[in-house]
Amino acid sequence: MDVSYLLDSLNDKQREAVAAPRSNMLVLAGAGSGKTRVLVHRIAWLLSVENNSPYSIMAVTFTNKAAAEMRHRIGQLMGTSQGGMWVGTFHGLAHRLLRAHHMDANLPQDFQILDSEDQMRLLKRLIKAMNLDEKQWPPRQAMWYINSQKDEGLRPHHIQSYGNPVEQTWQKVYQAYQEACDRAGLVDFAELLLRAHELWLNKPHILQHYRERFTNILVDEFQDTNNIQYAWVRLLAGDTGKVMIVGDDDQSIYGWRGAQVENIQRFLNDFPGAQTIRLEQNYRSTSNILSAANALIENNNGRLGKKLWTDGVDGEPISLYCAFNELDEARFVVNRIKTWQDNGGALAQCAILYRSNAQSRVLEEALLQASMPYRIYGGMRFFERQEIKDALSYLRLIANRNDDAAFERVVNTPTRGIGDRTLDVVRQTSRDRQLTLWQVCRELLQEKALAGRAASALQRFMELIDALAQETADMPLHVQTDRVIKDSGLRTMYEQEKGEKGQTRIENLEELVTATRQFSYNDEDEDLMPLQAFLSHAALEAGEGQADTWQDAVQLMTLHSAKGLEFPQVFIVGMEEGMFPSQMSLDEGGRLEEERRLAYVGVTRAMQKLTLTYAETRRLYGKEVYHRPSRFIGELPEECVEEVRLRATVSRPVSHQRMGTPLAENDTGYKLGQRVRHAKFGEGTIVNLEGSGEHSRLQVAFQGQGIKWLVAAYAKLETV
């Protein structure tokens, strides 16, 4: 039988994995090493060479997109669709199983799946029905608690509270939630896996049926599995099934949502004699980029070990840029992208990666100023985010009480006991009397036309808005914004959200304060009050909208969102201690290695050119912060890195330190630290100098106006 079509396009290690005898196998697949190709060709090998039936194969992926691509590529390779295989995500396959055996799983035939929004709404109702204070027992935290317990395979009666009243209350919420779901025939995502696992445990004959059927199990991205997913695979395989897992311990970056990189080692322990094959040849990046990635990840302990290599070109060195601040950093990145575009490169080939969503705002503004289209991958633009729109709505209502859209958004955010029934009365009266919602509320309260509790809550809300408007009127814009975020209860509400999502929302609110501090008037805004001018600016930015999907646009995304993607030109910004690695990882033991794996993922996204940037000073989350360069920069081989400009000592062993100083004076006669006066912006201090002659530029920090770049020849600055 001619099997050359299955092997000819593969390298030696890929061939070894594809053509191995049927056995348990770990394929350690480095970034860009062709793991999807290996999985597809392995399935084709099992079908055509080993003569296994499609019905014997289950392939598990982590996204529906990956599953669809795998099915498509298998069909292309085999020349026909292979019916009978189960190819899908853990959740998709568990759902299929429960549909087939709904009675044995104690589910109605027409059971419905709850998405996270539905889950939140149900929990909100239950917490209220249990007479619990929603501020103390937030629905989002309840959802996190329940999903975490299910991911560990735990039902309410399994949980040991040890007399802890907080744990006991969450246990009761979980119990009430589960009973409500069972009554209504509802199943959330975590329940799909747990219920399917319990089905096999409670009905051995069903488990045996699937063990006899699925004798070949293949699992992709194994480093991202959690405990219940591992238990699911282990139970199905039994003693006779053959399991091939594909994963990369160096790319395990989802520990915060329950992923267990240790599952790879558990597999080796539970399947003694399993073969390990390392895919180390990289088809994506240049040799310089791979050398940097290898050196970086070698600083982690307990790795299973592999070293990426390529037979491609050495490529350009990694560029390292030290910016004065985040504005300079954004300007530098945009200028580099402009140069790439001018040389014939597409904008879509450029990706800007950052650790935190809050970092995108300054980058977005720089791209907008350069009229450069961009797209936020897997996320929303800064001014479109929920928490930002909440805060802006408070500011809008303070600026204009008759803003009905802003009123609707914040009247019960955070919850104040102003229910839909009360608001329906307000809306109807507004229509009848042809008045705004605010005006109607005033009249209804004066007429005592609303129920007591709701009336009191509405009265307090209106007093809050009036007080904020009066007390903050003369404050600087950033102080006013910070006060509104705190006094409105928004900050407290989002602080109660568990996990990374809540932390991200707080960071974004603090970044909004920074945005108001850095905001500077355009000429057309000069007749407006600062708050009105900023709100106009925010509305216009949000109104720009995402670049159309067909449009050539720069890609912006978090490092987590970048996993699995590749780009010719990659920028990783904010490479500073406390930013990346994040402060949380420095404060919590065991998190630093996951941050380093995240850096490794970022570096290995780059195909041709990688640029790393850090700032000496950064106004982030509402305050000026001075950070040291990230330790990850110091872990890169010196010969792989070329510094565009260096302003601080890089954090690396003393023998490798490279030091530099900023340009202190240029041929215009201006000096760093010199006090100057501008006709429009007032007094400020020169914080950066660049270029010479007619191209000389100055960066000046103006009091109350932010930091601005000026062309020295046209600035007409006076020395103070």
UniProtKB/Swiss-Prot annotation:
GO biological process, one term: DNA replication
Annotated ATP binding sites: 32-37, 284
GO MF annotations in UniProt: 3'-5' DNA helicase activity; ATP binding; ATP hydrolysis activity; DNA binding
Name of one Pfam family that matches: UvrD_C
GO cellular component terms, semicolon-separated: cytosol; DNA helicase complex
Database matches in SUPFAM superfamilies: P-loop containing nucleoside triphosphate hydrolases (SSF52540)
Enzyme Commission number(s) of this protein: 5.6.2.4
Keywords assigned by UniProt, alphabetized: ATP-binding, DNA damage, DNA repair, DNA replication, DNA-binding, Helicase, Hydrolase, Isomerase, Nucleotide-binding, SOS response
NCBIfam families: PRK11773.1, uvrD
Function: Has both ATPase and helicase activities. Unwinds DNA duplexes with 3' to 5' polarity with respect to the bound strand and initiates unwinding most effectively when a single-stranded region is present. Involved in the post-incision events of nucleotide excision repair and methyl-directed mismatch repair.
Similarity annotation: Belongs to the helicase family. UvrD subfamily.
UniProt protein name: DNA helicase II
The encoding gene: uvrD
